[in-house]
């Protein structure tokens, strides 16, 4: 299984250095929780890992090779869920899931989309426009992608935001199963998360 490695990463925004000298190594079955106060660069680091930004210094390697030189071989193995979710108000829950999956390279039929949304506790709401859903329900629509994406690396920015206790347990279950099958996860969260059988690696940004 591949590894994800950060080597001496530096992030600069404007005239401010958010972090420097960041190193980590994530292996199969591993979960890395990125921690730090607001403005410390947590989201910036995740954006680097998914190719939306570049480090001012340092390298990010996937199985020993810089991610920029891998192109689709890396990006096709990764799913990124940002903290905003990307749910479109005028589309139904099922349309949102199918379109976001298609953008990630997954041709999702309506039956599988329905099953994923039902698993996330949205049974009966699949055909409702997203604008009538609560923030927690909209977040569940976004997180349903994890059931259908089929990628080894998940990069999750505040996945537990706006979720109630039952939804948090659902997400914890998804994470546990993904790690049990050799998946890898990098995530930020302001909440403590307990994952059965997982050694959580914590990366502190200051």
From Swiss-Prot:
One of its GO terms (cellular component) is plasma membrane. Its main location: membrane. The keyword Transmembrane does not apply. One of its GO terms (molecular function) is ABC-type heme transporter activity. One of its GO terms (biological process) is cytochrome complex assembly. ATP binds at residues 36-43. It catalyses: heme b(in) + ATP + H2O = heme b(out) + ADP + phosphate + H(+). It is a peripheral membrane protein. The keyword ATP-binding applies. InterPro entries: AAA+_ATPase, ABC_transporter-like_ATP-bd, ABC_transporter-like_CS, ABC_transptr_haem_export_CcmA, P-loop_NTPase. It is found in: Cell inner membrane. Its EC number is 7.6.2.5. Keywords: ATP-binding, Cell inner membrane, Cell membrane, Cytochrome c-type biogenesis, Membrane, Nucleotide-binding, Translocase, Transport. Residues 4-205 form the ABC transporter domain. PANTHER family: ABC TRANSPORTER I FAMILY MEMBER 1. Belongs to the ABC transporter superfamily. CcmA exporter (TC 3.A.1.107) family. The complex is composed of two ATP-binding proteins (CcmA) and two transmembrane proteins (CcmB). Part of the ABC transporter complex CcmAB involved in the biogenesis of c-type cytochromes; once thought to export heme, this seems not to be the case, but its exact role is uncertain. Responsible for energy coupling to the transport system. This is Cytochrome c biogenesis ATP-binding export protein CcmA.
